[in-house]
Amino acid sequence: MNIDKALVLRTCANNMADHCGLIWPASGTVESKYWQSTRRHENGLVGLLWGAGTSAFLSVHADARWKVCEVAVADIIGLEEPGMVKFPRAEVVHVGDRISASHFISARQADPASTPTPTPTPMATPTPAAANIALPVVEQPSHEVFDVALVSAAAPSVNTLPVTTPQNLQTATYGSTLSGDNNSRLIAGYGSNETAGNHSDLIAGYGSTGTAGSDSSLVAGYGSTQTAGGDSALTAGYGSTQTAREGSNLTAGYGSTGTAGSDSSLIAGYGSTQTSGEDSSLTAGYGSTQTAQEGSNLTAGYGSTGTAGSDSSLIAGYGSTQTSGGDSSLTAGYGSTQTAQEGSNLTSGYGSTGTAGADSSLIAGYGSTQTSGSDSALTAGYGSTQTAQEGSNLTAGYGSTGTAGSDSSLIAGYGSTQTSGSDSSLTAGYGSTQTAQEGSNLTAGYGSTGTAGVDSSLIAGYGSTQTSGSDSALTAGYGSTQTAQEGSNLTAGYGSTGTAGADSSLIAGYGSTQTSGSESSLTAGYGSTQTAREGSTLTAGYGSTGTAGADSSLIAGYGSTQTSGSDSSLTAGYGSTQTAQQGSVLTSGYGSTQTAGAASNLTTGYGSTGTAGHESFIIAGYGSTQTAGHKSILTAGYGSTQTARDGSDLVAGYGSTGTAGSGSSLIAGYGSTQTASYKSMLTAGYGSTQTAREHSDLVAGYGSTSTAGSNSSLIAGYGSTQTAGFKSIMTAGYGSTQTAQERSDLVAGYGSTSTAGYSSSLIAGYGSTQTAGYGSTLTTGYGSTQTAQENSSLTTGYGSTSTAGYSSSLIAGYGSTQTAGYESTLTAGYGSTQTAQERSDLVTGYGSTSTAGYASSLIAGYGSTQTAGYESTLTAGYGSTQTAQENSSLTTGYGSTSTAGFASSLIAGYGSTQTAGYKSTLTAGYGSTQTAEYGSSLTAGYGSTATAGQDSSLIAGYGSTLTSGIRSFLTAGYGSTLIAGLRSVLIAGYGSSLTSGIRSTLTAGYGSNQIASYGSSLIAGHESIQVAGNKSMLIAGKGSSQTAGFRSTLIAGAGSVQLAGDRSRLIAGADSNQTAGDRSKLLAGNNSYLTAGDRSKLTGGHDCTLMAGDQSRLTAGKNSILTAGARSKLIGSEGSTLSAGEDSTLIFRLWDGKRYRQLVARTGENGVEADIPYYVNEDDDIVDKPDEDDDWIEVE
């Protein structure tokens, strides 16, 4: 070795990298790229001069690579640490382990020739080593002192390497205690204690304590305590405490505490505390605390706390707290708290709190709070709160609150609050509140409030409030309020209020109010009010008020008021008032007033007043007043007054007054007043008043009023009024009025009025009025009025008015008015008016008016007016007016007006007007007017006007006017006018006028006028006029006139006039006139006139006139006149005249009988004079035209 060289010792990782990342070579030169001549460690290479000095900068890892470098003495700078030097470059001369490197340096120190005597540099502080002199030792080192001499003394001589290996290696400073078994290596600072088994490697700073089993590796900073079983690896910073059983791997920062079972892996930042069972893996940031049983995997950010049972997996952000039982998986963002029993899976965003029982799954956004029992699944958006018992499933949007018992399912939108017992299912829109006991099912729209007892089902629209006891079912529209006790069923329209006792059923239209006791059933139309005690049944039309005691039954038409005690049955028409004590039965027509004692039965017509004691039976016509004692039976016609004691039977004609004791029989003539008891027989002349109970036989003369009980037989003369009970048979003369209960048979003369109960058969003469119950058959003469309930069959003469219930069949003569219920069949004569509910079939004569409900079929004569509901089929004669909802099919005669809804099909005769909804198909005769929404198909005759929405297809006859939306297809006959939106296709006959949007295709016959936006394609017949926007393509027949924007293409026949903008292409036949802008191309036949701007190309036949701007090219046949600007090229044949601006070329093509030859002249400097007309004379010379001939050109 050269005496100007010194040896330096240093260590690297097993990949030859130092702590700065520099990769050292196995041999050869290494140099610092950022060298600075300072006494600092950075910006240079450092090491121990001759391998002696502080060990603070030597690697303690067992796999470290020890390198010996040869450094020039002149490059060495001494550092403050004992033995440490800095140098800019070095040559690596040896790489091995600690022992081989020590041997290498010791051998070189023993060689006098290789020992340098370096001259100190100005900045160097250490004393240079002399030959064969030991390196100086620091008296009070702050770190362990490393000396290659000590290492070499403990190892065999270099000449015997590697024959023998040391049994153990121990290096320590004063005050340390080292104890190692075979093949152990122990290194410790002063005041340390190290104890190791076989094949162990312990390295610790001063004041540390290390205890390891066999085959272990312990590395710790000063003041640390490490205890490890066999096959363990512990690494800790200063002041740390690590305890591990066999096969564990612990890594911790300074001040940490780690305790691990066998085969565990712990990694923690400084100040952390980790405790784990066997087969566990813990990773934590600084200041964290982790505790896990065997087989667990914990990962947490700094400042976190994690506690896990066996076989669990915990992942958390910084500052989080996680606690789980065995077989659990927890994942949380920073600042979260999660607590779970065994087998649970929790995932939450930052700042969340999750608490779960065994086998549960929790997922939550940031800032959420979740608490669940075992076997539960909770999912929530950010800022939500969920609490559930075992076996529950909760899903909520952000900011929601959910509380559920066991085995429940909750789904809610954002900002909702849900609380349920076990086995419940709750679904709510955003901002809703739901509270349910166990076994309930709640569904609500947004902003709703639902409260349910056990085993209940609630469904509500948005903004509703529902409260129910157990075993209840509530259904409500939006904005409704429902309150029910257990076992109730409530259904209400929007804005309704329902309150029900236990086991009740409530049904109401919108805006209704219902209150019922237990076991009640209430049904009401919209805007009604019903109040009932337990066990009652109430049915009312819209706007009614019903109040019932227990076990009562109330039925009322719209606008009625009913009040009853318990066990009562009340039936009333619209606008009636009924008051009854317990056990009563009341029946009245519309506008009636009834008051009954207990157990009474009252039946009255409309506008009547009935007062009865208990267990009485009263029947009266409209406008009557009846007062009966106990168990009395009163029957009176309309407008009568009857007073009877109990058990009496009274029968009186109309306008009569009857008062009878019990069990009496009364018979009276017309205008009479009779009062009789039950089972009485009353006979009265006409104009009499009779009142009788059921099973009575009444006979009355003309103008009589008869009122009979059930199953009575009544016979009356002209102008009589009869009122009969159930299953009665009534016969009356002309102008009679008959009233009967259900299943009665009524026969009346002309001008009669008949009122019958259920399933009655009524026959009346001309001008009669009949009213029948359900399933009745009515027959009347001319001008009659019939009213029947559902399933009735009505037959009337001319000018009659018929009103029927559901599924009725009506037949009427001319000028009749018919009104029928659902699924009715109506037939009427000329000039009739028919009104039917949905799915009705109407047939009318000429000039009729028909109005039908949903899915009806209407047929009408000439001049009729028909109005139909949805999906109707209408057929009308000439001049009719039809109005239908969507999906209707309309057929009308000439001059009709049809208006149809969505997707309708309309067919009309000549001169008709049709208006249809979306996607309609319209067909009309000549001169018709059609209007349809987009997507429609219209077909019209000659001279028609059609207006359609976009995507429509229109076909019209001659002289028609069509207007359509975009993307339409229009076809028209001769002389038509078509207007369409952009992207339309128009086809028209001769002489038509077409106007379209951009990018349209127009096709027209001869002499047509077309106007289109730019980019359109136009095709027209001869002598047409076309006007198009820019970039259009125009094709026309001979004699046509075409006008287009720039960059357009125009094609026309002979005798045409073409005008186009710049960069256009014009093609025309002979005798045409073409005008275009700059950079255009023009082509025309003989005797044509062509004009274009600069840089254009013009080509014409014989006898043509061509004029163009600068830099143009003109070509023409014989006897033509060509004029162009500067820098142009002109080509003409025999007899042509050419004139051009400066720097142009004039070419004359001449035929000599065998071939063509050319005469060329150039204008400008060195050429002929510019802007002078030239021609070829008889001598084949190019000469200019004389001035006197300048005006020879004849321009058309």
Swiss-Prot record:
Its main location: membrane. PROSITE patterns: ICE_NUCLEATION. Keywords: Cell outer membrane, Ice nucleation, Membrane, Repeat. Residues 271-298, 319-346 have a biased composition (Polar residues). The keyword Repeat applies. Pfam families: Ice_nucleation. Disulfide bonds: none annotated. Residues 269-304, 319-352, 415-442 are annotated as: Disordered. GO terms for cellular component: cell outer membrane. GO terms for molecular function: ice binding. Contains many imperfect repeats of a consensus octapeptide A-G-Y-G-S-T-L-T; further on a 16-residue and a regional 48-residue periodicity is superimposed. Belongs to the bacterial ice nucleation protein family. This is Ice nucleation protein. It comes from Pseudomonas syringae. The lineage of its organism: Bacteria, Pseudomonadati, Pseudomonadota, Gammaproteobacteria, Pseudomonadales.
